[in-house]
UniProtKB/Swiss-Prot annotation:
A family per Pfam: OpcA_G6PD_assem
Coiled coil regions in record: none
Protein name, as recorded: Putative OxPP cycle protein OpcA
Biological role: May be involved in the functional assembly of glucose 6-phosphate dehydrogenase.
Signal peptide extent: none
InterPro entries the record matches: G6PDH_assembly_OpcA, OpcA_G6PD_C, OpcA_G6PD_N, Peptidoglycan-bd-like, PGBD-like_sf, PGBDSf
Gene coding for it: opcA
Organism field: Nostoc punctiforme (strain ATCC 29133 / PCC 73102)
Length: 465
């Protein structure tokens, strides 16, 4: 499809304060009308408002993003009239506000996140509406807002087209399609609106798989294509295989994995099969990796790296994926081979892993899932890590902690005082999936460092089998 340029006939005054201008509100169409309807949007605007006094609107020519959103929160919020933004599977400020509204109405803790209690309420309300013949009517009407919001960070990257796939429960009634168009308001560019086309496809998982052959035709040729698979990737899932084969990058977030160890093994299988994979949770480790590397910048410290034979990593109990990926990265850089793997569950989730170094030294690593009162948005964030040696003369000790009091347990064990180097990781707001995705779509292809680290992590799990 070629780039189109249009004049905006009636730009509302509200545009000056809104972050998104709705060029075309979501409209129900049949599957074979998608391209024709999108073309019609541009043609209808192209013959209006030719006075040249208003900002023009141009369809972005950047990338296509396919979002597979198995978690039904956004769809339910829209169907019940709480949410009036695009159904894109991306958690943005408007989603959080809608969740808080539901929670306030039903006297639940106002977290702005999809807690289990909130989901239960949404499902019950949706079921009541279906029985009364009104369920889902807001799924369209509730989206007809004058100023809907694409998740801010994604909008700033000006995607050309977002295709959102929403598997839903219930009877198989085929696939429903909607198209719409939105233009993020860029403060630095008031003369032109860069617009994004939205295609939303919803139906049962079986129905979506049936029409999977049509989806590649909806991707815009000549532009990078990203698949954000917000479920556990299944190498045997037909729809996943079809989409992964045609996208430049397949993006997952292991912080949401229900069974992190077996799910990370699945990721390794995909890498071995040649899938260009990216894990947003891996990107959350960047500051920890950078500080660890900086700790051994000096020649003396670098020479002592081989003396490291004790590793302790504390993480927020609930998901060990970050801790395991960090350990996989460290082991891959220092060429350690895993030889044993043990787990203990209790107040703390303890994992003990033994490695053999290149010079046949024994290396012991302990991962501890620490219970915390407020987990926050990301389950399993790193809290602290300690690298040390059984050789008291070795200058290789390092302790790195998060700024949220992460060193308390390390200090109890004498680690922070005895370490040769102590550093803190500043808590970063961009650790949420929305912002990390915004960074990820600026690059594509295979990530060798991630793949090597994942390979070592997978070898650890295989010791348990």
């Amino acid at each position: 499809m070629t780039k189109s340029k249009i004049s905006n006939p009636k730009l509302p005054m509200a545009l000056q304060t809104s972050t998104i201008f709705s060029l075309q509100a979501p409209k129900d169409i049949s599957l074979n009308e998608i391209d024709a309807e999108l073309n019609q949007i541009w043609q209808s605007y192209g013959i209006t408002g030719e006075d040249g006094g208003l900002p023009s609107a141009t369809r972005a020519t950047t990338f296509t993003l396919v979002v597979y959103e198995p978690e039904e929160t956004q769809y339910l919020l829209a169907a019940l009239g709480f949410y009036n933004g695009p159904i894109d599977g991306i958690l943005g400020p408007q989603m959080a506000a809608a969740l808080r509204e539901v929670q306030k109405k039903h006297k639940l803790p106002e977290t702005g996140t999809a807690t289990q209690e909130t989901l239960t309420i949404l499902r019950e309300e949706f079921a009541k509406g279906q029985r009364g013949g009104t369920g889902g009517e807001h799924a369209i009407a509730g989206l007809n807002s004058g100023s809907p919001r694409i998740a801010d960070e994604i909008a700033l990257r000006n995607p050309c087209r977002i295709i959102a796939l929403f598997p839903i429960t219930g009877e198989d009634e085929g696939v429903k399609a909607q198209v719409s168009a939105y233009c993020p308001i860029q403060k630095q560019s008031s003369s032109t609106l860069i617009c994004c086309e939205y295609i939303t496809l919803s139906g049962t998982a079986a129905a979506l798989e049936r029409i999977g052959g049509m989806i590649p035709a909806l991707l815009i040729g000549g532009l990078p294509k990203f698949l954000w698979w917000k479920a556990t990737p299944d190498p045997n899932n037909g729809l996943f295989k079809r989409l992964a084969a045609i996208c430049n990058n397949v993006i997952v977030d292991s912080c949401n994995f229900n069974e992190p160890e077996s799910d990370l093994l699945r990721l390794e299988e995909l890498v071995e099969a040649g899938v260009p994979l990216a894990d947003l949770n891996w990107r959350r480790l960047a500051s920890w990796q950078e500080l660890t590397a900086e700790a051994y910048d000096s020649p003396k410290r670098r020479a002592a790296l081989r003396e490291i034979d004790r590793v302790t990593i504390d993480y927020e109990k609930g998901n060990p994926a970050q801790a395991l990926l960090f350990l996989g990265w460290l082991a891959s850089r220092l060429e350690w081979q895993p030889v044993s793997y043990q787990k203990e569950s209790g107040d703390y989730d303890i994992t003990r892993i033994h490695f053999i170094s290149q010079d046949q030294r024994q290396v012991e690593a302990e991962l501890a899932g620490v219970p915390v009162a407020d987990v926050g948005d990301i389950i399993g964030d790193l809290i602290a890590l300690r690298l040390s040696s059984t050789n008291p003369q070795a200058d290789c000790g390092t302790v790195i902690c998060s700024e949220t009091g992460g060193c308390m347990r390390m200090e109890t064990h004498g680690g922070a005082q005895s370490a040769g180097l102590f550093q803190q990781v500043t808590s970063l707001s961009e650790q949420k999936a929305e912002a990390l995705l915004s960074q990820q779509v600026q690059r594509w292809g295979r990530e060798s460092l991630f793949e090597e680290s994942l390979g070592v992590t997978a070898n650890i799990f295989k010791l348990a089998n």
